[in-house]
Amino acid sequence: MAVAKKDLVEMQEEFEESKVEKAKHSFYLPVKGKMASEKLEQGGLKIGERLLVGTAKVLWPLFQVINKVHQGKPFQPKWAPAPLLKKKEKTFPEFGWPRKTDSLCPRCVKEVRESIIAGEKDFTHLINANPGEIKANIVEKNGKIVMVKTCEKHGDFEDTMAIDAKFLQRIEKLYPGRDFKSPMTHLRNHGTSTIKYGRGSVLTVDLTNRCNMMCDPCFMDANQVGYVHELAWEDIKEILDNSLKIKPRRQMSVQFSGGEPTLSPYFIQAIKYCKEVGYFSVQAATNGIRFAESPEFAQEAYDAGLRIAYLQFDGVDNASNQHRKISNLFDVKLRAITNLAHVGIDVVLVTTIVNSVNDHQVGPIIDFAIQNSDKITFCSFQPVSFTGRDEDISDEDRQKHRYTLSHLAHDVKKQTGVSEPLRDWFPLSAAGPFSDLTDYMMGPDQDFGNLKCGCHPNCGIGMGLMVDKSKKAWLPLSEFINVDRIMKDVVDITDAFQPKWLTKLQVVCALLRNFKPGKAPKEMKLKDLVRKFDKQTGGSMT
């Protein structure tokens, strides 16, 4: 029983090998451009997959009986402040609508910041006085979800949260629950903004406010604030060291940002230090200019430990990048992508989407990424946030240019014709159950817990794709895997805290019962599915 998962994979491999052996003695007849034996082989493999899937569906209820009759006890990892949590022990924010929430008056926020810069108030005023905070109502209007709020000083504000109420309802429903409640320390004391659960998954360190571009929009208003703010080496080291002291001590991806982080004199040194102290992933949010200018700089960054280039990318031609004020910026991006990929740095296309400016580029950018899937890992579309250089935007322009997560889901379908908004999209936090599974499988003695994104479901969404790099074709994972159900299955498996061999067997069973052989790509085999899942959970299954 301890090797049951291995047996399932080997059954598939042996079945394939037997078919190959038989094919050696087959007559080859052309059938629509393919050999008859190849057709028979593929058909046999699909039959074998269906048998395994059917067997898994029969076994699954039996495993659930075992889990109800006998459950193990959760342990407390040394990186965590408490024993591992079951779903029933997790807490949830308030969802649905109408509901009230805490918000900010955009005018008050600006006034408070200016008073601190002028020396009229200390920065601790932000922590102790909660300036600019007001209540807001989240309601549905004409099928849209909007936030409505009133400031006694500056009047009424209204903004769109979603253009599709059913979409937002689905996203909130899939939230898996909060992580550990975080112990309060002086490092976490940020007033109302204090992270109260978990610890986040990305530590963003702004190395400098200098930049070699003049973008519009710019979240940071780089180069325009009238002074240079650049972290000294002691500051960088202190931030990275302090982050390691916070529990739960989960792994994080450190993202160096700015301004343009590559302009910092400590950029390479900071990357090296991250790897030395144990951060497993280091990325840079960059416009790519320095990497385009110098392949040697890209190599130096890779050698230091840079894993991901979070590359600003607004469209697939120079015209779509004109708001960045560089006429040939797309050509620069192509050179940066080539240089980064050549040395082994993963490239993520990061697109700030502004409604009526570049929202038509969503489909072309996805297609560009698919066509260059040997160089590009994934796309990150970021709906515009009116901060920094754009905080003085008029209410009329804000409504005109507002772009929400629901806009993105519908634009992907409209511009690619492939995905389904109410099936293929998930909150980023939906990956939490897989992190919980990995935490259990890795045992109590790990120095770090698994990376876990616990952000609010209104914060970010994602869609998993299966890409055929040879044919440049793609499918959403939900087309051939019941992702909604497998997430629930993983929660049930982890909550049972069974012996590891039984947990592994149940995970393989869950993968099989949620696999749809008839809709999967022809090249996709069950053993590939198991191996990919194992890779995504940090090798917890092997």
For each feature predicted by the language model, list its residue ranges.
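N-terminal [4Fe-4S]-dependent radical SAM core
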Residues: P74-T204
